Amino acid sequence: MTVSPNTAEQAYLDLCKRIIDEGEHRPDRTGTGTKSLFAPPQLRFDLSNDTFPLLTTKKVFSKGIIHELLWFVAGSTDAKILSEKGVKIWEGNGSREFLDKLGLTHRREGDLGPVYGFQWRHFGAEYKDCDSDYTGQGFDQLQDVIKKLKTNPYDRRIIMSAWNPPDFAKMALPPCHVFCQFYVNFPTSSPDPNNPKQAKTAKPKLSCLLYQRSCDMGLGVPFNIASYALLTKMIAHVVDMDCGEFIHTLGDAHVYLDHIDALKEQFERIPKQFPKLVIKEERKNEIKSIDDFKFEDFEIVGYEPYPPIKMKMSV
């Protein structure tokens, strides 16, 4: 038996297998049915040296991950903006039929309501529609995270949450990836505030811990892992840090019944080394704010996955 050097991806595959073998059979909102475990062991991914945890045992839609994250960061909630870029992952939840089923008959197609991006950038603002300008409204959690990392990196409140119960009735889908916390490790000795001239041997390392309440292991989780790894990378660049780890805490970790055969095919594959994701050299000095990033700024190097495996999204 060949043992993969990529223990992080193997841990993900082993968890999927355990859910299929031991999980409880449960009905679900979509009507598809799942096998589910609650609060399995965390998944951990090393992000140092530009490592990017994009699964290798199937080709993952990296274009979709980058575009969706930039869409969150922009505070956008309009699925049509993503669709126009060839990223159709939100079309089901933004369709006329789906919105009408939720009673959101007044909402135009593609308007998802106050979902992730709105909560990240305008928490507490009153949501009208996806075409309104919310500049200066609500609380900008993402900028608050960045400010704390720059001014008080030891803070234990460096947190961003998409969980806002009063807004649920307006959302096409309440958040699955709910809440993340950032933590800074300082190399060797901690910086001495009384000695500003102290030599810095290396940059501090930024790590991210995500709590995800609902974890679609086959289709969604590979996306979420890469997305939060990329978010950590972007924030680290803006605050002049290196990346440490991404730690993924899962609540209801489930495999949809119609994904089991596809995952069994994936289990036969031996994980390869993760690729690297770099910010293009010519743009590094130009990107000073989290809002400066563009799709073209990122380059994924050394990604040699196995072929794609089709899995249907349950809406």
Curated annotation (Swiss-Prot):
GO function terms (MF aspect): FMN binding; phosphopantothenoylcysteine decarboxylase activity; protein phosphatase inhibitor activity; thymidylate synthase activity
Keyword annotations: Methyltransferase, Nucleotide biosynthesis, Transferase
Taxonomy, superkingdom: Eukaryota
E.C. numbers: 2.1.1.45
GO annotation, cellular component aspect: cytosol; fungal biofilm matrix; mitochondrion
Catalytic activity: dUMP + (6R)-5,10-methylene-5,6,7,8-tetrahydrofolate = 7,8-dihydrofolate + dTMP
One Gene Ontology term from the biological process aspect of the record: dTTP biosynthetic process
Protein's pathway: Pyrimidine metabolism; dTTP biosynthesis
CDD domains linked to this entry: TS_Pyrimidine_HMase (cd00351)
Sites where the protein binds dUMP: R29, R156, R157, R213, S214, C215, D216, N224, H254, V255, Y256
Binding-site positions, (6R)-5,10-methylene-5,6,7,8-tetrahydrofolate: D216
Catalytic residues identified in the record: C176 (nucleophile)
Any Pfam family hit: Thymidylat_synt
Family: Belongs to the thymidylate synthase family.
Subunit annotation: Homodimer.
Name of the molecule in the record: Thymidylate synthase
Species this protein is from: Candida albicans (strain SC5314 / ATCC MYA-2876) (Yeast)
